[in-house]
Amino acid sequence: MKLLSVNHLSKRYPGFALQQVSFSVYPGRIMGLIGKNGAGKSTTLKSILNMVHPDSGDVKMFGMDFYQHEKECKQQIGVVFGGVDFYPLKKLSSITAVTRRFYNAWDQEKYEHYLNLFDLDDEKKFKELSNGMKVKYLLSLALSHHAKLLILDEPTSGLDPVSRDELLHIFKRITADKARSILFSTHITSDLDRCADDITYIQNGNVLKSADKDAFLRSFDHLRTSEDKQPLTLEEIMLRTERSDFDETAL
């Protein structure tokens, strides 16, 4: 069963439109949502979660219509958005005490397990954490109510290479049980080269391609030149696609 199915999702703003976005996330897989800044990645995630109200389309989670069963679905997902500072002067323990009230399946033992795993001190204030530790804390909250689907917006943005490497390793461990899945947006394509199973590429509010990573890479073979001795990387695909789009628009 698909954990997430997004069907023809659209949202229009002055000067920008998310148009007929469709893709699916399956159990035990990591889906990377790529695109340059302003392509529509965050709007897609916010529309999926009903943080902004889509103009049309539907979202199914765990076989249920998300917009009709939003409360029930949100019990089974974890959401991490970059740049969220919660209450910077509050201790982690205080933030957790409030957060746990929202989840019927909150598991304190599991929470303490992740605190130890991520080397987090819940007597620290949120503002005292590095960017990497903030993401780990938010992941701890997301995982402590047995979330089946994690939705992450630019989770590795602004992290140093060591912290990014550690988080990508954590993502792989999370999905190793083949029951949980991750959907995360990023413009750092090297992260997806290392951990993604599937790729959805958004350009100017449209899904250019959504497929498993190997099929995705093969579908852009037409961008290769006689000088390319190896298959194109995600970064090369994105650069050549965006450059082509810019050249056509400029001309």
List each model region and its residues.
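Catalytic Walker B motif of ABC-type/P-loop ATPase nucleotide-binding domains
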Residues: 150-154
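Helix-to-loop junction immediately C-terminal to a conserved catalytic motif
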Residues: 49
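Conserved ABC transporter NBD signature motif
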Residues: 57-68, 72-73
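Helix N-cap at the start of a conserved alpha-helix in ABC-type nucleotide-binding domains
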Residues: 161-163
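The feature captures the beta-strand-to-loop junction immediately N-terminal to the Walker
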Residues: 34-36
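Conserved structural motif at the start of ABC-family nucleotide-binding domains
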Residues: 4, 18-19, 74
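ABC-family P-loop ATPase nucleotide-binding domains
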Residues: 81-137
